[in-house]
Amino acid sequence: MAKRIIYNEQARRALERGIDILAESVAVTLGPKGRNVVLEKKFGAPQIINDGVTIAKEIELEDHIENTGVALIRQAASKTNDAAGDGTTTATVLAHAMVKAGLRNVAAGANAITLKKGIDKATEFLVGKIQENSKPISDSNAIAQCGTIAAGNDDEVGQMIANAMDKVGKEGVISLEEGKSMTTELEVTEGMRFDKGYISPYFATDTERMEAVLDEPYILLTDKKIALVQDLVPVLEQIAKTGKPLVIIAEDIEKEALATLVVNRLRGVLNVAAVKAPGFGDRRKAMLEDMAVLTNGQLITEDAGLKLENATLDMLGTGRRITINKETTTIVAEGNEQAVKARCDQIKKQMDETDSSYDKEKLQERLAKLAGGVAVIKVGAATETEMKDKKLRLEDAINATKAAVEEGIVPGGGTTLAHLSPILKEWADKNLEGEELIGANIVEASLTAPLMRIAENAGSNGAVIAENVKTKPFNDGFNAATGEYVDMSSAGIVDPAKVTRSGLQNAASIAGMVLTTECIVADLPEKKDSAAPAGAPGMGGDFDY
């Protein structure tokens, strides 16, 4: 296909147009008074949401070059989402501000490579400052505050996540389900999560989120490599008759068997997903046995004289729901409390008997996975549209609280970055010179962008508020919900340090790449035929065949 090649200023301006469109669509959701965005869907009802990264993923422009700009900024949002699970809108607003300021300097003749060096040095300095100013999370009240802010100022959500963390521990698993009622409920049940995802992405049932969710599945546990599909056929035939999904957790599944499972899954013959078992050697076998106890099934192993080809339905485990993404698998089981408790006691005995600190650590890991359970939040809402929005907010809130537990919290509402702006200026003036200093100044000027946008969305003058906040102590900021200047920590307006750090790093990275772009190669737009072919006689001409 023929390509269009654009150079220099023209290339950067085309990227900038795409970046402007995406940034504006996402920025309207920022802050306590941010608005919602409606996404029109090809199938099903429109979605009304407030989640930056989901909006960014939906935007696609007709112009290929502008679309490249959209894709670049979308990457800043996605990477922040992957690292911290929240702060995607802040990352987008920051990246947009840095690109705008940077392009002005490049157009005026500044060297883009040296500017990028300055941006990178400034970012490194700021990351250190964010870590210096972060406070560790001490109580469930701080967890609730983090959850509340991430969920768009929903106190009920923040409190529910704090309760869930109290019950399953700070490292515990919190899972989301669509509830059957109007209210959102919390329930703690048996379950575990391990760090292995699906073997093939074709097992994903939700292609937008790239995860497989299987309700009431059978679970086949084996410690052998499955090389031939013939080994699986007897058990697959039995399961196909029941109409229930199947999850296979095995040492590995080789190409031929995997291809057969994928084909059956895609044709809708059998809803199946396959996962590699976690761990190695004896530890892998022990973890599979833990899962067998949890799911009320048997581990099919030749050590116990059990073969795959002779497996029956009563040897398989069952669960309430299994969620698998590319990195983790979460099993939610129920009704096996006694068996799980007995297994935990057995692991504790082994811990008492062993002298090896390594074995003790690994046994402790297994015990935590098995005994911790899973907190299930059942999301309730009046309509499906509200349910989807609530689920996204809850997901952000869960990720934000986990990030806060990891790296601590800093004052929220864009306050931390705004206060770091004069500190960065002072450092840059002393330590950098020439165009590197200009690069650092680009970052410094962009740091107030999130606060300004939060204020503007609340109907205030962003520039005035940003200048006022800079003159106040580090903890003081602007509460956009009430329109007052307050001590952010006391008011419960806090952000996880990890979210602020990731957003800044990803924004600076994308801005640096855009500024150093000198040429774009993109597809030429396709010429559309002026006359559309009519349908066959007696048929509508506007069907897609």
UniProtKB/Swiss-Prot annotation:
EC number(s) stated in the UniProt entry for this protein: 5.6.1.7
Keyword Nucleotide-binding attached: yes
Subcellular location: Cytoplasm
GO molecular function, one term: ATP-dependent protein folding chaperone
Gene Ontology BP terms: protein refolding
Classification via Pfam families: Cpn60_TCP1
Keyword hit for Transcription regulation: no
SUPFAM superfamilies from the UniProt entry: GroEL apical domain-like, GroEL equatorial domain-like
Residues holding ATP: 29-32, 86-90, 413, 479-481, 495
Record key words, sorted: ATP-binding, Chaperone, Cytoplasm, Isomerase, Nucleotide-binding
This protein's GO CC annotations: cytoplasm
Catalysis performed (reactions): ATP + H2O + a folded polypeptide = ADP + phosphate + an unfolded polypeptide
Source superkingdom: Bacteria
Family: Belongs to the chaperonin (HSP60) family.
Role: Together with its co-chaperonin GroES, plays an essential role in assisting protein folding. The GroEL-GroES system forms a nano-cage that allows encapsulation of the non-native substrate proteins and provides a physical environment optimized to promote and accelerate protein folding.
Subunit comment: Forms a cylinder of 14 subunits composed of two heptameric rings stacked back-to-back. Interacts with the co-chaperonin GroES.
Identification of the protein by name: Chaperonin GroEL 2
Annotated source species: Prochlorococcus marinus (strain MIT 9301)
